[in-house]
């Protein structure tokens, strides 16, 4: 059995997310599986590192699939890019060890979030950022971000779909940056609960708008109550930026 690692970019705007919903419908996983299955002549499943939600994008998603036959990497890449829709791109194909698993072997993930922070809308970025038309206090956001770095129980920053044995995750870095009309947030960690990144961003937006005190973050973490964060940042601004193994 041969195991192949795919590196994938996609514009998630028109898709229902990564995870196939029972058949090869309008999901990233479904589209790629359909083309791979046609290529190898049998139904083939791919395993993604991150099950991104509807509307979320990826700069470096990683997945793997297995094949009975040995495949030529550059031919696989060419075939997939020829038959996949043009908002999904395979940037690399590599044969890896048969025990490589895209989800379970990942050691760190990095997400980038883009906020368009001008009074006027940006028509070119409406599917690729969240528009906040009031000026954000980036200094306060940076102070709040410090409280989220480290190992914490992130129940308050998840939703009801997050039913993991442990809600503890470690955030390695959390940066807030300003650049040409945008406020960008980059977060790296060993793993993330469902909606955790979007709720972290939502909390930072609330802080930036003066709706939440930066010093309230430790109490929110401690309380473990999901209703403490009112803002769930829009999917459109979120990008899976990098995965480390």
From Swiss-Prot:
Active site residues according to the UniProt entry: 53
GO MF annotation list: RNA binding; tRNA pseudouridine(38-40) synthase activity
First-tier enzyme category under EC: isomerase
Catalytic activity: uridine(38/39/40) in tRNA = pseudouridine(38/39/40) in tRNA
Keyword tRNA processing recorded: yes
Gene Ontology BP annotations: tRNA pseudouridine synthesis
Entry function: Formation of pseudouridine at positions 38, 39 and 40 in the anticodon stem and loop of transfer RNAs.
Subunit record text: Homodimer.
Family stated for the protein in its record: Belongs to the tRNA pseudouridine synthase TruA family.
Protein's UniProt name: tRNA pseudouridine synthase A 2
């Amino acid at each position: 059995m041969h195991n192949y690692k795919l590196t994938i970019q996609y514009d998630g705007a028109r898709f229902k997310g990564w995870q196939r919903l029972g058949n090869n419908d309008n999901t990233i996983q479904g589209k790629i599986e359909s083309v791979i299955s046609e290529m190898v002549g049998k139904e083939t499943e791919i395993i993604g590192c991150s099950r991104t939600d509807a509307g979320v994008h990826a700069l470096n998603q990683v997945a793997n699939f297995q094949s009975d036959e040995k495949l030529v990497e550059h031919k696989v890449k060419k075939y997939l890019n020829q038959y996949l829709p043009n908002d999904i791109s395979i940037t690399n194909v590599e044969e890896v060890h048969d025990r490589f698993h895209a989800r379970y072997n990942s050691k760190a993930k990095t997400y980038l979030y883009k906020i368009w922070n001008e009074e006027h809308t940006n028509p070119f970025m409406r599917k690729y950022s969240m528009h906040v038309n009031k000026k954000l206090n980036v200094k306060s956001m940076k102070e709040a971000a410090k409280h989220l770095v480290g190992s914490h129980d992130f129940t308050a920053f998840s939703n009801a779909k997050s039913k993991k044995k442990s809600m503890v995750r470690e955030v390695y870095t959390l940066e807030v940056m300003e650049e040409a009309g945008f406020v960008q947030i980059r977060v790296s960690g060993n793993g993330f609960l469902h909606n955790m990144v979007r709720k972290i961003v939502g909390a930072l937006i609330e802080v930036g708008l003066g709706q939440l005190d930066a010093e309230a973050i430790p109490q929110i973490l401690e309380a473990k109550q999901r209703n403490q964060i009112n803002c769930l940042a829009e999917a459109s601004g979120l990008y899976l930026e990098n995965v480390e193994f």
